[in-house]
């Protein structure tokens, strides 16, 4: 399950938690269970088989809920990034795709949301430089939603946005 909303004056945390509460209630008919934080900082329900992930930008919050490990990351399409970051965060394969891309800003944002979602999925976060992960610019797990690039990754099948 996927939900998104504009922040409308709320913090990303507040909006994300509101989305999570709504999704969990819709999926289970139950109130939101307690949330604990793992050793590497990944939040999880302490007594539920459901998994969730939240991401927010300056304008939007996104939440996914599933019965398998799942992760989401989002970036506003109009966000301008320092393109020199490509040298530090992209694998050689990704760098070749980045160099060939007509829209380098979008290319870097695409790789970034995939790397962030992958790090969230693992539960370990990004440690060191994330250039040891390799993705493709045409990865079907990245979609446009509400003016954002959104990546959703699961342990199992691709989650359709």
Please give the residue ranges for each predicted region.
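Core catalytic alpha/beta fold that binds nucleotide/phospho-ligands
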Residues: 1-161
């Amino acid at each position: 399950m996927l939900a998104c909303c504009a922040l409308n004056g709320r913090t990303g945390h507040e909006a994300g938690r509101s989305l999570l509460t709504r999704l969990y209630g819709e999926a289970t008919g139950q109130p939101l269970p307690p949330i604990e934080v793992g050793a590497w900082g990944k939040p999880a329900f302490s007594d539920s088989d459901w998994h969730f992930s939240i991401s927010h930008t300056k304008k939007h919050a996104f939440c996914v809920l599933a019965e398998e490990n799942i992760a989401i990351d989002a970036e506003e399409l109009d966000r301008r990034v320092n393109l020199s970051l490509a040298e530090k965060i992209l694998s050689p394969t990704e760098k070749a795709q980045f160099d060939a891309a007509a829209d380098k800003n979008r290319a870097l944002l695409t790789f970034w949301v995939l790397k962030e979602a992958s790090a969230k999925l693992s539960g370990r976060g990004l440690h060191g430089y994330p250039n040891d992960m390799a993705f493709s610019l045409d990865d079907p797990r990245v979609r446009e939603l509400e003016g954002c690039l959104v990546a959703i990754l699961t342990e199992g099948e691709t989650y359709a946005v």
